[in-house]
């Protein structure tokens, strides 16, 4: 209830609380960026794609390449599949 009145009355946050919030934001940003080059799900996604494509086409698993690139605020997943000759 006190925080509600603080909000209404415009009580300023203490410097320690502001610093703590900023640190939490920085840590969250660093943690999310740590594995941004290759997320944990990428190898599993590649295995699943190989399994699905293998149902329809006889393909070498090495002929499927996944690449994740970051372009500004956009993640782009590129999938290259080298299909066998008929």
Curated annotation (Swiss-Prot):
It comes from the Bacteria. Disulfide bonds: none annotated. One of its GO terms (biological process) is regulation of division septum assembly. Keywords: Cell cycle, Cell division. InterPro entries: MinE, MinE_sf. Pfam families: MinE. HAMAP family: MinE. Prevents the cell division inhibition by proteins MinC and MinD at internal division sites while permitting inhibition at polar sites. This ensures cell division at the proper site by restricting the formation of a division septum at the midpoint of the long axis of the cell. Belongs to the MinE family. This is Cell division topological specificity factor. It comes from Polaromonas naphthalenivorans (strain CJ2). The lineage of its organism: Bacteria, Pseudomonadati, Pseudomonadota, Betaproteobacteria, Burkholderiales.
């Amino acid at each position: 209830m006190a925080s509600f009145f603080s909000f209404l009355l415009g009580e300023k946050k203490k410097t320690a609380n502001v610093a703590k919030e900023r640190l939490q934001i920085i840590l969250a940003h660093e943690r999310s960026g740590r594995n941004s080059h290759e997320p944990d799900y990428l190898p599993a996604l590649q295995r699943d794609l190989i399994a699905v494509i293998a149902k329809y086409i006889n393909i070498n698993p090495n002929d499927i390449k996944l690449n994740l690139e970051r372009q500004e605020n956009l993640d782009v997943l590129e999938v290259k599949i080298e299909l066998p000759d008929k």
